[in-house]
Amino acid sequence: MDMTQLYNFVSNATYGAQALVAFWGTFCVVLIWRRVAQKRFEDEGAQNAFLDDLARSLSKGDFDGAASLCEGNQRAVPQLAMLAILNRKIGFAKVRQLIQDRFQQDVMSDLDNRLTWVHTAIKTAPMLGLYGTVLGMMAAFGKLATADRVNPTQLAEDISFALITTAIGLTTAMPLMVAVAGINIRIRRMEELVAAGLNHFLETFQAAVAPTAKKR
């Protein structure tokens, strides 16, 4: 394999790597966006309606009925409420700590891990563009140094490759940066909504488990 063949191979591989980074970054953004939507209620009104239904069951001491309301609901508040109900015998303080830890581990850590991949794509895309720029300029100057007469078309192809890879890298990174900003806003709103919902639930839950604790 001569240098021209090697250059062509690496050039095509650079395009392939850029396409892969763009696809993976976009895929992770879509996953995070859907994950946040899956874990939160549409608005505070919908969440309060669910919590009111839950409070009616808890106020009657109907823990099984309350658990059935949460069952099958993949949102964070119902899942954490069900966890609290199933572990009510360990005491209110431990239950509160348990659901806080589980929210951080099961929801926030998962989102942070996926978001890390998006940040990696944002950093990698321009670097691949810079790599393509270096390859293109090396090829162009290599032809200038070794040929008596240089074909302007060949030089234009090398310089074009350098500029195209740079443009692709920036075009990949910039929308992902905007998407990350939007995702961070959605995550922050989800945290605020879940925190408000859990505070509401814990007040009702504490009152419901108090008579049980006194009996023991």
Task: Give the location of each predicted region.
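Pore-lining and gate-forming transmembrane alpha-helices of multi-pass membrane transport proteins
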Residues: 15-19, 153, 157-184
